[in-house]
Amino acid sequence: MTQLTYIRERLSDETLRLQLSTVVADQEALIPQSEGEYAELQKLGLYPTEECVPFVTKQGTPYYQLDNMAMVPKGDTGNYLRYGDFVFRQLEVLYIMGRMDSAEAHRWLRDNLFQGCRVDARKKAEYKSKFRGLERADWKVVQTDWMSYCLNLKYRCNALFRRDLAACGGRLPVEDATGTRYASNLFWGAELVEVNGRKYYFGCNVLGKLLARQRKEKVLPYSLPEDMHLFGEAILSI
């Protein structure tokens, strides 16, 4: 079986297509026409494990700070993330704010997310449910540019993130989605598979590709709609 055949067969699975439909409008567009397209941002690919640096959302694991869900240690204020006067410890907070076109939603998330020193995952789910009708109609289009913006902010604020990114060397960062069930994981990350006796990570790995580019260029390019706001104000420049 060729690699491209494997990818096409995986995407023929209706369950996977349904999962990917939550993050991309056209699942067919994810299929590469050649192995040379694996590096394109929104293309599925097979990435040899020996060329990858996997990371997961678990404190104490290697490259932990590369994950959007990673927490800056409590009290390490020099590495806290800052958007204007909003100070927070987890990049995912800023990322999911951009999903909703509502200052009320942004303030609710800011004021309700933190429970003591931990981020309450239940509040994230409540946020998406409470304000679902206010989700940006173009979210599937703008989400990767918004992620680039968020990563730029994290790179500027967090030395732990810069350290882990540099430690990857020339290898490809991969958000390891093996064994996870989140619908978007094979878009942002990739899972461990075996094809023709060789181990690969399979997925779009959009986050990993953005990180690889940021390691090289420091600042990721992005283009956001003029009507995209946070807290009722225009997005701050980075």
Annotate each language-model stretch with its function.
Residues 2-238:
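Charged, low-complexity intrinsically disordered segments
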